[in-house]
Amino acid sequence: MDEMNEFFTRDKANEGVEVPLYLPTGAKSKHWLKLLGVDSGAYALATARMRQALQGIQAEAGKIEDKEARFVFVNGKQEEWKNRVLSACISAWSFETECTEAEKLKFLEAAPQIANIVDTFIADRRLFFGMGQAGLKTSQEVK
């Protein structure tokens, strides 16, 4: 069994890692996000909720006759749910604003570059084991 432990990722994904944030200019800020990985319970629950919601969204979209309006509606809902999944993987942050679901969603919507970083980081299991920075922008580093 001990040999199998080398492959276990869930505990590290649930523990999370602090990732420093950089401003859009590339300058380092004093802020950070604590991110959970794709193997975390939070990610699993959020993606299950998203899959269920997307079924309802497709049914609702079917009622929209205009093809372009239907596309815009579905695209908006997909983006909203993507951010919900990403926000579930933010367990803490350094901002004075409380780290609530609503605040995380507002932040990700207003700062899509941060949403991209979160999406890239949480999917790279190596980063939860302190193994490099593959997939991160060069201005990002892992604590």
Predicted region positions:
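A generic structural signal for ordered alpha-helices
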Residues: 21-24, 64-68, 100
